[in-house]
Structures are given as structure tokens and as C-alpha cells.
């Protein structure tokens, strides 16, 4: 049995109306909970950065990626402070709990082309704090002052 499909016209207004539900659905990670999040291994440097014993850096992203470049720009901001290549950062959806809400919308939401602006300081701060923690840990381990240490290419050096 065959059926001939005929194209239908779809107005821009109708497209926007019908795609709204899809965009909303893209914002709501299904089944993500604190329990699922706790499955990661490694040290949580802060709310957004986890570094595993194998040196895998994972960023917990509190914005959705749906072709808007959110994950790329957030990785770049974090990598800039950590002195690593942004492409080496693994991504994981952050839990949908208040500490990960957008500072702009005060809920778990990605909208209005504001990811870069709303995550600039949180990502840069998270990266800078994680870097400072790494330098402090190396300083204690190597018994040298932290100000003598540098970072670059995902490495702490003295």
C-alpha cells in the first residue's frame, strides 16, 4: 500500500506556535537527579567543575545546547581560566536544582540569547577557583609557595 504525501503550507506564526513546546521540552532534562549526578567520580572543585583522577575535566552545564553554541561558549570561558583547551572539557547536564538556576531567570532555563552574558561570571569564577585549588594542592604537595607555580596546557609546573 502506498500513500502520496502532499506538502502543506505552514505559516511562520504557526511554526513558532508549534515549535514552542519543542523548545520548552529541550530545556527539561529527563530523569536527571542528584542521585544520577552523584555517580561521577573525581573531585568537585566547585558547583560547575569536576576533575577526575585521570585528569578529565567535566563542566556541569546549566544551559541547554540546541544549536545555539551554549556548550562551546561555556567551555571556552571555563577553559580560559583553567589554562586548558576548551575541546578537552567533557560536558554533563547540571542537576535541575536551585543552585544551578540561571542567575538571570532564576530557574533552569535557556532562552533569549543570554547564555554568554548570564554565564560569563559564573564560568570564569568557577574556572579561576578550580585553578587556584589546583595550585594550592600542588603547592602543599611539592612544599613550594603557590606563587612560584604556573599553569598551562592542562599542567601545573614549578
Protein language model regions, located:
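N-terminal secretory signal peptides
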Residues: 1-10
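Short, surface-exposed loop/turn segments at secondary-structure boundaries that line and modulate
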Residues: 3, 56-77, 87-128, 132, ...
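N-terminal export leaders
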Residues: 10-29
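Short, small/polar residue-rich loop motifs at catalytic or cofactor-binding pockets
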Residues: 43-45
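Short, surface-exposed charged micro-motifs
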Residues: 48, 81, 141, 147-148
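Short, acidic, Ser/Thr-enriched surface-loop or helix-capping motifs
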Residues: 52
Amino acid at each position: 500500500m502506498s500513500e502520496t504525501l502532499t506538502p502543506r503550507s505552514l505559516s511562520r506564526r504557526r511554526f513558532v506556535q508549534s515549535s514552542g513546546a519543542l523548545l520548552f521540552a529541550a530545556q527539561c532534562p529527563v530523569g536527571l537527579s542528584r542521585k544520577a549526578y552523584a555517580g561521577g567520580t573525581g573531585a568537585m572543585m566547585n558547583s560547575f567543575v569536576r576533575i577526575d583522577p585521570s585528569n578529565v575535566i567535566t563542566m556541569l552545564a546549566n544551559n541547554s545546547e540546541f544549536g545555539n553554541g551554549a556548550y562551546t561558549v561555556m567551555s571556552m570561558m571555563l577553559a580560559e581560566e583553567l589554562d586548558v583547551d576548551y575541546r578537552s572539557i567533557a560536558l554533563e547536564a547540571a542537576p535541575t536544582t536551585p543552585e544551578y538556576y540561571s542567575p538571570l531567570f532564576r530557574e533552569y532555563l535557556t532562552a533569549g540569547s543570554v547564555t554568554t552574558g548570564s554565564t560569563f561570571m559564573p564560568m570564569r569564577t568557577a574556572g579561576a577557583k578550580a585553578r587556584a585549588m589546583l595550585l594550592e594542592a600542588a603547592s602543599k604537595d611539592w612544599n613550594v609557595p603557590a606563587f612560584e607555580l604556573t599553569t598551562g596546557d592542562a599542567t601545573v609546573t614549578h
